Swiss-Prot record:
GO terms for molecular function: rRNA binding; structural constituent of ribosome. SUPFAM superfamilies: Nucleic acid-binding proteins (SSF50249). One of its GO terms (cellular component) is cytosolic small ribosomal subunit. Part of the 30S ribosomal subunit. Pfam families: Ribosomal_S17. Residues 1-46 are annotated as: Disordered. The gene is rpsQ. This is Small ribosomal subunit protein uS17. The keyword RNA-binding applies. The lineage of its organism: Bacteria, Bacillati, Actinomycetota, Actinomycetes, Mycobacteriales.
Length: 126
């Protein structure tokens, strides 16, 4: 009996290691790519970020500086913390002025520091 157990133990590893080459598996299913009948679904691109802020500078050509405000609740103390960030945005027609409330959309890098573009002017400054 002990001899039979040793021979069957030796035979088992050789049977599991003898897999067909090229990643093909019996039944037409590949380990890497899934079943053949499964259609490939293109990955959906994430939506672009939209932000609303106030123009603080319009002195550059076709560029505005917009102050974006972000409010978050402190995880431990619960206080509302207000943080601001200034970003450069592309204004093709140079229509936005200082104090305007504008809507921005994230876009591909347009320059070393410009990654936003003006979508619309929500409210003109008085």
């Amino acid at each position: 009996m002990a001899a039979e157990a040793k021979t069957s133990a030796k035979a088992a590893p050789s049977a599991t290691t003898a897999a067909p080459k090229g990643g093909a598996v019996k039944g037409g299913v590949s380990k890497d790519k899934g079943p053949k009948h499964t259609p490939s679904i293109p990955k959906v691109r994430g939506g672009r970020k939209m932000r609303i802020g106030y123009v603080v500078s319009d002195k550059m050509q076709k560029t505005i500086v917009v102050e974006l405000e972000d409010r978050m609740r402190h995880p431990l103390y619960g206080k509302i913390i207000r943080t601001t960030k200034k970003v450069k945005a592309h204004d093709e027609n140079s229509v936005a002025g200082i104090g305007d409330r504008v809507s921005l959309m994230e876009t591909r890098p347009l320059s070393a520091t410009k990654r936003w573009r003006l979508v619309e002017i929500l409210e003109k400054a008085k």
